[in-house]
A protein has these predicted regions:
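Membrane-anchoring alpha-helices and their flanking helix-loop junctions
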Residues: 1-89, 103-176
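Glycine-rich acyl-CoA binding loop
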Residues: 91-94, 98-101
Length: 176
């Protein structure tokens, strides 16, 4: 909803509602994941070293997701400009156009590998599919309207799967 509002597809008067939908969506994701993990954990008979490794990987992907969504973009440079919003093509956003999808998927994959369970697997698959559909909408509809240079960014940076060149650019821009 927020992206549709920013792309001027929805009226700005709906801003309060878009914030509400974000909070509701976040809470649904959090609660459904917690319930699925709790159910899967109930059937565990013992804990292994491998599960500990998978849990650490879950935490790593979760931290990458949080960093990418909330800290990787410089707010002023990305959102507060005189001549429209510009894309940011350094760090994580040199890797691919939607790096959060990689970390979100990795987080759910390793969470499922840690605890197992059909419910958690189904939830992970649904959430990852919905996340993918969301970034397809962003990439094709909303971001080209929000970011004045998005089509140029699309030519330089891969959609989801990093390339050798984009990995090198990510590392290079992080060093600077």
């Amino acid at each position: 909803m927020y992206d549709l509002e920013q792309a001027r597809i929805l009226p700005l008067q709906l801003h309060k509602f878009t914030q509400f939908f974000f909070v509701i969506g976040f809470l649904l994701l959090l609660v459904s994941t917690a319930v699925a993990v709790w159910h899967a954990a109930q059937s565990l008979s013992e804990w292994s070293i491998l599960q500990t490794v998978f849990l650490v990987m879950t935490a790593l992907f979760f931290l990458l997701l949080i960093y990418t969504l909330f800290f990787a973009l410089p707010f002023e440079e990305t959102y507060v400009t005189q001549n429209g919003c510009k894309t940011y093509d350094r760090g994580m956003y040199a890797l691919c156009r939607h790096p959060g999808v990689l970390w979100f998927t990795g987080c759910y994959l390793f969470l499922w590998m840690t605890f197992g369970g059909k419910e958690l697997l189904l939830l992970a698959m649904i959430n990852c599919l919905l996340n993918f559909l969301y970034v397809v909408l962003q990439d094709g509809v909303t971001f080209p309207r929000v970011f004045t240079d998005y089509n140029i960014y699309k030519q330089r940076v891969p959609f989801l799967i990093p390339t050798v060149k984009s990995i090198q650019m990510c590392i290079q821009t992080w060093k600077n």
